[in-house]
C-alpha cells in the first residue's frame, strides 16, 4: 500500500475523531458492498451458496445511491457471495474511480475459484491508480482447505492467483477463517501460519446465512497460536495484529463484550445484495438503496437511533475484520493499550 494512501486513511480518521468531539456526524468513509449472494464455493461453515439470488442490486441502483456522498468515500470493500461472478464489475470500478475523487482503496475478498478472472479484476483496479487489496480466502493446507470449502482443487487455484498477483506487485494476502474444522491444521503448524495476514473466526448468521455451533475454546486456542506466529511485515499489518489480540480477549469474554467501542455506521456502512443498508451484517437494516440514496438513509431518524444503540454498546457484538480496523483507528489510545497489554 502506498504511503499517500496510508496518510489519507490516517487523515480521514483524525478528521472523524475531531468531528465527533464536536458532536458532529460525519458520513462514513468506507462502504462494504456484498454485490451478490451467488457463490461457487460450498463452505461447511456458510450456507450462502444455497441461496438462489433474486432481486439483487444493479449497477444503475448503485450509481443512483451514491449521489451526494461521492467525495466522502475513501475505501470500498467488495465481496459476495463471490465477487468474480459479478458481471458489471468493470463498470462499477469505472464509476467509483471516476466519481469518488477521494477514493484510495478498493478491497476484494475472493475464493480464487476463477483465478484468471479475479487477477484481471485486480489488475484493472491497479491500472486506475487506486490501491487494491485482494484477500485470498485460504483455510489451511490443501486437504483441509478443499474439505472446508467443498471444492476439490481450490487450494491450487489460491496458489495460482497469489503467484500472479505477486508477480504484478498487486497488494494481496491470504485470509483465514478460524473454525473447529481447521483447528488441527492450525495447532500442528508453525512458521507456515505467518502467511496469514487477515484473520477472522466463524460467526453465525450475517453473510454466513447459517447457525454455526460454537467451538470457541478451540477457536480461542487457534487464534492464540496464529498470534504467536504473526509477523508484521508492513505498516498495515499492525492493525491486523491488534485485531487478533482484541479478538482473543473478545473470545475470552464469550463474545459478550466489546473490548473497544464499535464504530460501524460512523466510519463504515454495509450494503447487502438485496439493497438493504446496515451498520454491519448482523444488525437490522436502516434503509434500502433501491428506494432511497445513501445520504437520505444516513440522515434518517432510524440511523440516528441506531447510532445511539451502537454508542451504548447495544449491538450484536462480533469483532469481525470487516469492521474492526476502523474501530481500532477511531479508538487509538485504547487500541494501543490492548497492543501492549
Briefly describe each language-model feature range.
Residues 128-278, 282-288, 292:
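Radical SAM enzyme [4Fe-4S]-AdoMet core and its adjacent flexible, acidic
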Residues 27, 259, 276-341:
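Flexible mid-to-C-terminal extensions adjoining Fe-S/redox cofactors in radical SAM and related proteins
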Residues 1-27, 228-254, 328-341:
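Alpha-helical membrane-targeting segments
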Residues 46-49, 121, 148-151, 292, ...:
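Residue-level signal for well-ordered alpha-helical positions
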Residues 3-131, 331:
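Conserved alpha-helical substructure of the radical SAM core
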Residues 46, 50-54, 269, 287, ...:
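Cys/His-rich zinc-coordinating "finger/knuckle" motifs
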